[in-house]
Amino acid sequence: MVIFKTEDIVRDEAGKILGLDHSLKSTTLEIGVGQLTTFKQLGFESDKKPDGWYLPKNRNDVAIILETKNSNEDITKKKWINELFSNIDIISRKYKKIVGILYNGYNIDVYKNKELINTAKTLQDKQYYIDLFKDNSIDKNKIYS
């Protein structure tokens, strides 16, 4: 039997799994989960409030934005996808490599920028999502054969 989880519980659990610990915040990284922090406080032009964020000061690095819902919500609903995409749009003003995660405690959809991609069926540590942008090596021998 699936146990109902409030959005607060889902957000807190997701923050722990992803490793979005506020104590890791530094001069080179904005990181955390919450419901009070606005994008404006994170250096963007919006009063919207993300559920979770990983925002390196190096804008060439991968940024992660988390949108959580309670466990009864269908994360494939267009309104939730649009909410995540709106948050991706906000941070895309500074970052070109963005992972957007939509999560309800049981189901997960992951977007590389705004493209839905196949990933692990359970939420992973942030490094897993950062690695989605690693360059694939080119096999020159295969190309020229």
What are these regions (language model features)?
Residues 1-99, 107-144:
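A short, conserved, highly charged catalytic patch centered on acidic carboxylates
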